[in-house]
Design a protein with these regions (language model features):
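Phosphate-group recognition and catalysis centered on beta-loop-alpha active-site segments
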Residues: 1-149
Length: 149
């Protein structure tokens, strides 16, 4: 009797495990199956800065989607730039959120001819897929509202 109960219990345990196992036939979402170039397909050693138009064009050419960082300037323009501070990428002191776009547009990224792009310029590239990270702790609401325009 005990062996019969144990066999029935074991059968039900195996049935539960079988029914709740991951199904490999379930289609994965694009987010899980596509490849994304983080901040564009950049290569600082080759003079292709992160979050630059050149990096995004390179990613598009090689078939990647792109992850990028968006933040709002003082005058409400959406720019693609990772750091809150400009120093690492431009050599200039200052915060993106405290400067107008007219003060940013002539800055060069890592000494190249690449500049800080407007988000609209990146959208105009018609990239395959985009993952957009909203930067700046104080201005998230402004960025979201600007994205919705």
């Amino acid at each position: 009797m005990m062996w019969t109960a144990l066999a029935i219990f074991s059968f039900f345990c195996l049935l539960v495990i079988y029914l709740y196992r991951p199904n490999p036939r379930i289609r994965k979402t694009k987010l899980c199956t596509n490849h994304y170039a983080h901040r564009g397909l950049y290569d600082h050693g080759s003079g292709i800065p992160e979050n630059s138009m050149m990096a995004f064009r390179r990613a598009k050419h090689q078939g990647y989607g792109c992850e990028l960082d968006v933040q709002c300037t003082k005058d409400g323009k959406l720019v693609v730039f990772h750091d809150d501070d400009l120093k690492r990428m431009t050599g200039v002191e200052g915060l993106v959120s405290q400067l107008k776009y007219s003060e940013l547009e002539n800055l060069r990224l890592l000494g190249t001819n690449e500049r800080i792009p407007l988000f609209k310029e990146v959208l105009d590239l018609d990239l395959k897929e985009l993952l957009i990270e909203i930067k700046g702790t104080q201005a998230r609401q402004r960025v979201v509202l600007a994205l919705l325009k």
